[in-house]
């Protein structure tokens, strides 16, 4: 398995600081930049940020981590991804999820009541057809197209990754996706998730490539988990010890990544749990530490 470790900007991903942060990542030779979907925030929107970052760099990959698919029309999403892949071949890393992380944003991605999972499944099926077929005719419960084409298809089909950690989400990865990016799971839990995904894939006679399993890992550089992140963990994982889900400094990050690799994961998105003043200059020491402490773990 090829271990690769990318970076999410965290609170440094605002328009005022984004360009400087992207330039620093490129200069430092970081593998990839990941952009979360947080509409009610000052963070750059993922597809906009990906286009900007890819146009400004020549090596850096860019991923959406994680964008909401249900509530978006898959034809429009396919057009965006095909355009990005045409402009920056081999550097586009789409990851999709079922719903936004913030409850307040769910109304922005409207789907029929009680049908979000079904819409997600159908959206993924249509999205993949549009990215691989010259002309697509599709009649589903939620989407219908006839002779649809986005006009350009990636020379190599894009790998579509999904997030999520619920059993149904993991089985969806096995049935419909090319990879998985989890979060807030212990190494043991992540290893079990890999097993669930591969079992679901086998049931439909497919396989997720062994090196297509990853995790988003927050790093608390001073060892203290910020209150906002702590509240989020307690909301999502009330039974879990937060210290098992957040790396305490770079030593903790190296140790945890090693444990995740032993559990069968090889792709990681590391983000700062907090930054002093939420600006790009404050992010630069994080990048320097990341390059010094974590990049040598790649192979």
Report residues per predicted region.
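Active-site-adjacent structural elements that line small-molecule/cofactor binding pockets in enzymes
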Residues: 1-299
């Amino acid at each position: 398995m090829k271990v690769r470790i990318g970076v999410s900007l965290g609170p440094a991903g605002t328009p005022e600081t984004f360009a400087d942060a992207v330039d620093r990542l490129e200069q430092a030779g970081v593998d990839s930049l990941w952009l979360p979907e947080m509409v009610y925030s000052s963070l750059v929107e993922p597809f906009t940020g990906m286009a900007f970052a890819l146009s400004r760099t020549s090596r850096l990959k860019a991923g959406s981590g994680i964008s909401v698919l249900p509530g978006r029309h898959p034809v429009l999403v396919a057009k965006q991804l095909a355009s990005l892949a045409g402009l920056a071949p081999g550097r586009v890393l789409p990851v999709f999820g079922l719903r936004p992380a913030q409850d307040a944003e769910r109304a922005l991605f409207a789907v029929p009541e009680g049908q979000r999972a079904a819409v997600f499944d159908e959206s993924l099926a249509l999205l993949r057809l549009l990215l691989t077929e010259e002309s697509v005719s599709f009649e589903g419960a939620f989407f219908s197209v006839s002779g649809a084409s986005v006009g350009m298809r990636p020379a190599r089909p894009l790998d579509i990754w999904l997030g999520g950690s619920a059993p149904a989400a993991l089985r969806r990865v096995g049935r419909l996706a090319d990879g998985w990016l989890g979060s807030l799971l212990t190494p043991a839990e992540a290893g079990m998730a890999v097993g669930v995904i591969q079992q679901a894939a086998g049931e439909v006679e497919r396989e997720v490539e062994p090196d297509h399993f990853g995790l988003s890992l927050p790093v608390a550089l001073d060892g203290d988990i910020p209150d906002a992140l702590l509240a989020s963990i307690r909301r999502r994982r009330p039974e879990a010890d937060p210290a098992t889900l957040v790396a305490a400094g770079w030593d903790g990050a190296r140790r945890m990544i090693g444990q995740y690799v032993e559990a069968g994961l090889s792709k990681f998105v590391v983000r700062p749990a907090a930054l002093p003043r939420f600006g790009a200059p404050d992010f630069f020491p994080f990048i320097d530490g990341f390059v010094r402490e974590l990049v040598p773990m790649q192979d």
